[in-house]
Amino acid sequence: MTTKFVFDLLAPDDILHPSNHVNLIIRLIEVEHIIIATTMPAV
């Protein structure tokens, strides 16, 4: 379910255009932080 959530945020064009790979990586990092923030209890 989490994986589908991530893929839903990523437009297919991001993968097709190498110039967008940096933005894709940044977005993945942001998504990862959101997932961690929402699933892990705040310490």
Swiss-Prot record:
Highest taxon of source? Viruses
InterPro entries found in the cross-reference section:
Corona_NS1
Entry's family note: Belongs to the coronaviruses ns4.9 protein family.
This one is known as Non-structural protein of 4.9 kDa
